[in-house]
Amino acid sequence: MSCQTRFDEFLVLEFSDPGYGAVHHLTVAAYLLQHSSQLTREGWLYERDLLRAFIIENKPPSLIRKQNRDKVDSGKRDFKIKSKTGQPVIAKTTWAKTICDVRAENAETYCADVTEWAKSAFGESEKIVIDG
């Protein structure tokens, strides 16, 4: 199963069951961090900063949304998040954990696995230096 297929299935699960949706913010940020061709350089750095806020600073998504409202408003933002070229922002990386390692048999297991995956992705991403 491809990462994209798995991601799409998990989004459906997260939007249809609040127990799974509790980690939606981590699912999206970790996935995008590991699939840099979907982002601009600034977008990739922004997603990494989001994971830092969620994981290291333990900030809830509601606070981050409030703090970043103007920063990510497409009418006010001074950078693009989504890539128009599809070119990877980072060199090909072999990640220790990916979305394919997440189990979905119940919400508790799913949330624990997504959290561990996001922590792993963030930790590895901290070692990646992006020129520019």
Label each PLM-derived region with a short phrase:
Residues 1-132:
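Intrinsically disordered, low-complexity linkers and terminal regions
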